[in-house]
């Protein structure tokens, strides 16, 4: 892989690690190590692979649009392609620069993008620009299909017996705020694209700015029902965790109180 190609791969992997998961969520990410053919059409090598985990939210369309933006600035002739597949051992997201020519033979039967996708062994979901648009078309007005008005996220439900992907469309509480944040994110990446297009020496990336923008962008997202569900579930899980911890700490006192109550009932029982 050429020096410029390596820099492109480095930057695309940084985008995934910075923006795919929610703030504070760690990603099990593996980048290509054998030199992906960056400028080859239909290559079988993914730029990076993310092992998806249970109960997580992934900002798929946001990362996809970011990739598309960077590649367009580099005058790359093809569109990115994301593939989520289940090989029986794990469910992974593989990010390609374009759709692999042997997607079916690699990842099995391709399922359509729906609200709930049951990802059985040797099945996959292939995501391109048209797939995001088609999924949103039945859920939002045509004027809201753009990146500033709605985005597709994926929430995972994984057990030992079933792998489920839930695709949701989220909309921002403030369109102006989201547009401003996205423009800031793209501006951070603009020097990267210029450097790659010109074969420059480096890719200036500020990890702190990236993390800050990630938190701000996800905070602005407001779902109709789906987003509220995400936030309510998060609050419920936090409250449940605090309640369990409180019960554990207080259990000696609680058990003593129950014992005294039982003794009192025995003493008060008429003979």
UniProtKB/Swiss-Prot annotation:
Residues 1-249 are perinuclear space. Forms a heterohexameric complex with NEC1. Plays an essential role in virion nuclear egress, the first step of virion release from infected cell. Within the host nucleus, NEC1 interacts with the newly formed capsid through the vertexes and directs it to the inner nuclear membrane by associating with NEC2. Induces the budding of the capsid at the inner nuclear membrane as well as its envelopment into the perinuclear space. It is a single-pass membrane protein. Belongs to the herpesviridae NEC2 protein family. It comes from Human herpesvirus 8 type P (isolate GK18). It is found in: Host nucleus inner membrane. The gene is NEC2. Keywords: Host membrane, Host nucleus, Late protein, Membrane, Phosphoprotein, Transmembrane, Transmembrane helix. Residues 268-271 are nuclear. The keyword Isomerase does not apply. Phosphorylated. InterPro entries: Herpesvirus_viron_egress-type. The chain crosses the membrane at residues 250-267. This is Nuclear egress protein 2. GO terms for cellular component: host cell nuclear inner membrane; membrane.
């Amino acid at each position: 892989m050429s020096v410029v190609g390596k820099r492109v791969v480095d930057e695309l992997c940084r985008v995934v690690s910075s923006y795919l998961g929610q703030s504070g969520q760690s990603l099990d990410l593996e980048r290509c190590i054998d030199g992906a053919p960056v400028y080859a059409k239909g290559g079988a090598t993914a730029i990076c692979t993310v092992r998806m985990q249970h109960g997580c939210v992934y900002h798929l369309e946001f990362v996809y649009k970011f990739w598309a933006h960077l590649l367009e600035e580099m005058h790359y002739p093809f569109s990115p392609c994301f593939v989520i597949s289940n090989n029986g051992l794990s469910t992974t997201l593989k990010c390609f620069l374009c759709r692999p020519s042997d997607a079916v033979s690699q990842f099995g039967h391709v399922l359509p993008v729906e609200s709930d996708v049951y990802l059985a062994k040797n099945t996959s979901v292939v995501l391109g620009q048209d797939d995001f648009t088609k999924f949103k078309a039945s859920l939002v007005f045509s004027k809201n299909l753009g990146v500033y008005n709605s985005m597709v996220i994926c929430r995972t439900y994984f057990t030992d017996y079933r792998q489920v992907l839930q695709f949701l469309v989220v909309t921002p509480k403030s369109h102006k705020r989201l547009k401003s944040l996205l423009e800031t994110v793209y501006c951070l990446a603009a020097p990267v694209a210029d450097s790659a297009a010109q074969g420059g020496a480096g890719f200036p990336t500020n990890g702190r700015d990236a993390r800050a923008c990630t938190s701000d962008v996800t905070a602005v997202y407001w779902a109709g029902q789906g987003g509220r569900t995400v936030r309510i579930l998060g609050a419920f899980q936090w409250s449940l965790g605090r309640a369990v911890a409180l019960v554990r700490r207080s259990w000696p006192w609680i058990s003593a109180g129950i014992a005294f109550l039982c003794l009192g009932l025995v003493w008060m029982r008429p003979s």
